[in-house]
């Protein structure tokens, strides 16, 4: 399983959030019907996880709660028909449901506990560190890692499969959570082996699922696989474009890439469609991936940004959403100050609600959302600041300026996103010479200099206030001190401060 002398393992924790909730309740994660979702929101809320036994009924791992409700109703209607018209007690256990057809399918709805999931994920990462050094582990997400295990196989006198199984069983003993693994001769192949192959292989005697791929076995086993969206980095947009020209599989992509210049299907066709990203698509179609672990560890982005976004619980009016935008801008400023970063460019994106088009009174530009519904096109605007700063006043004024001039006040609002771009460290700015101030013939230089001094004094006072707020929040919690606007109707900061990643902590 080595190409150019490298062997990689990817490990994915099975239905991680749902498994944590099952273990906390003393239930079997593999046989308990459970979804992780905030039922206090509407049934449109997204399920963060669905347990394997519930997925077996055809429920997506990222379903909306109402989709789970509807699908379970359908399943129970079919069970009722087969049982002669009556179903008795509900059961959330797959074994009980299989043995007793008269029982109705039930399921548990567990509210998210993001802090708990982070704690368990850290515990599992520490298990991996017993076997692999941190420089050879890439944490891909809260429930997924990739490892370069090349130098460890000889040390442990193990095959890659044996090492993967050893770590998975250790995680199971430590936390009760099961995992699947993919082994490959490069990072792409180990990821695809885990994502696609491991789900379909038979578990071994210990219940562990591990799949292996090299370039040749990848071509033999997955060149005809559908859908394309199962492959790493191929989203719905890519798949739709490829299918529009008759390309449905990775094998089709590979064949297209070696077409002659005078043929319709050739490499140039892919580059015209996807630009430079076609190179990665073609490499992956052939099972190639030049990126190594040291490349990931050495990577530093050319530009940095901080983004804050939220989906509102219900449609907000222009004025009500403006209050939330102010809260978000102030939070972004505090975040920058805490990280000792400054920005001179801010971007605001506002998404409108579906209700704006429901009555047929809206006649502006529309787009189609992922559910095929027509909604007003989002508003997007950028504000450039005269100097790099983390001042809440400067950032808030700039963002609200974009909001007031760009957003349609007649439309109800559902999504808000603020991005602080072109970030640099405070110390970097302090070392740069100040930009000269341009005066004209009619300016009173003394007055202008006085204004600049007053502005500097205001910024220093504001910074002290912001630093004091940060200290209070760190000691007593994020809600220990809030701006007055956060107590008004429609404000969201107080509730969001209790969340991690937009979900209950």
Task: For the regions a language model picked out, list residue spans one by one.
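Gly/Gly-Pro- and Ser/Thr-rich, intrinsically disordered tail segments characteristic of DNA damage-repair
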Residues: 1-286, 290-293, 441, 446-505
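DNA-contacting surface of Y-family translesion DNA polymerases
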Residues: 3, 10, 230, 238-413
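Short, charged/polar surface micro-motifs in flexible loops or helix N-caps
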Residues: 14-16, 40-44, 352-357, 423-426
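Short aromatic/hydrophobic contact patches that present stacked aromatics
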Residues: 146, 384, 417
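A glycine-rich phosphate-binding loop feature that marks nucleotide/adenosyl-phosphate handling sites
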Residues: 185-188, 283-285, 342-354, 412-424, ...
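Short conserved micro-motifs at the rims of enzyme active sites and ligand-binding pockets
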Residues: 358-362, 427-433, 494
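C-terminal hydrophobic structural anchor segments
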Residues: 401, 405-471
């Amino acid at each position: 399983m080595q190409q150019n002398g490298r062997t990689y393992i990817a490990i994915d924790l099975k239905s991680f959030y749902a498994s944590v909730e099952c273990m906390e309740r003393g239930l079997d994660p593999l046989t308990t019907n459970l979804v992780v979702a905030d039922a206090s929101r509407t049934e449109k809320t997204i399920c963060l996880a669905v347990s394997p036994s519930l997925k077996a009924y055809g429920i997506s791992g990222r379903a909306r709660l109402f989709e789970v409700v509807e699908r379970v109703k359908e399943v129970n209607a079919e069970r009722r028909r087969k049982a002669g018209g009556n179903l008795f007690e509900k059961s959330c256990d797959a074994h009980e449901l299989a043995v007793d057809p008269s029982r109705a399918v039930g399921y548990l709805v567990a509210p998210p506990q993001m802090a708990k999931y982070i704690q368990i994920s850290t515990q599992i990462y520490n298990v991996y560190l017993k076997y692999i050094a941190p420089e050879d582990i890439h944490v891909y997400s809260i429930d997924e890692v990739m490892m370069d295990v090349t130098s460890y196989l000889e040390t442990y006198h193990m095959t890659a499969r044996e090492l993967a199984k050893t770590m998975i069983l250790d995680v199971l003993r430590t936390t009760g959570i099961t995992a699947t693994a993919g082994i490959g001769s490069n990072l792409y192949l180990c990821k695809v082996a885990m994502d696609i192959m491991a789900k379909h292989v038979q578990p071994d005697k210990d219940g562990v699922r591990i799949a292996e791929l090299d370039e040749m076995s990848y071509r033999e086993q997955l060149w005809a696989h559908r859908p394309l969206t199962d492959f790493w980095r191929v989203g719905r947009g890519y798949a739709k474009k490829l299918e529009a020209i008759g390309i449905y599989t990775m094998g089709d992509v590979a064949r297209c890439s070696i077409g002659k210049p005078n043929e319709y299907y050739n490499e140039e066709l892919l580059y015209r469609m996807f630009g430079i990203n076609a190179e990665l698509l073609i490499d992956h179609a052939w099972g190639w991936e030049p990126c190594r672990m040291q490349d990931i560890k050495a990577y530093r982005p050319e530009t940095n940004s901080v983004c804050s976004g939220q989906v509102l619980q219900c449609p907000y009016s222009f004025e009500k959403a403006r209050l939330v935008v102010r809260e978000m801008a102030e939070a972004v400023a505090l975040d920058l100050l805490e990280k000792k970063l400054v920005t001179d460019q801010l971007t605001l994106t506002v998404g409108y609600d579906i209700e704006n088009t429901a009555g047929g009174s809206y006649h502006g530009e529309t787009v189609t959302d992922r559910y095929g519904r027509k909604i007003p096109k989002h508003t997007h605007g950028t504000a450039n600041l005269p100097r790099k700063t983390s001042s809440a006043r400067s950032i808030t004024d700039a963002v609200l300026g974009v909001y007031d001039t760009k957003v349609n006040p007649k439309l109800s609002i559902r999504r808000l996103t603020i991005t602080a771009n072109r970030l640099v460290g405070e110390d970097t700015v302090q070392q740069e010479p100040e930009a000269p101030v341009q005066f004209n013939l009619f300016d009173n230089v003394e007055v202008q200099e006085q204004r600049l001094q007053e502005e500097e004094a205001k910024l220093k006072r504001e910074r002290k206030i912001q630093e004091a707020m940060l200290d209070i929040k760190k000691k007593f919690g994020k809600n220990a001190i809030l701006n007055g606007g956060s107590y008004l109707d429609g404000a969201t900061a107080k509730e969001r401060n209790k969340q991690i990643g937009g979900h209950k902590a």
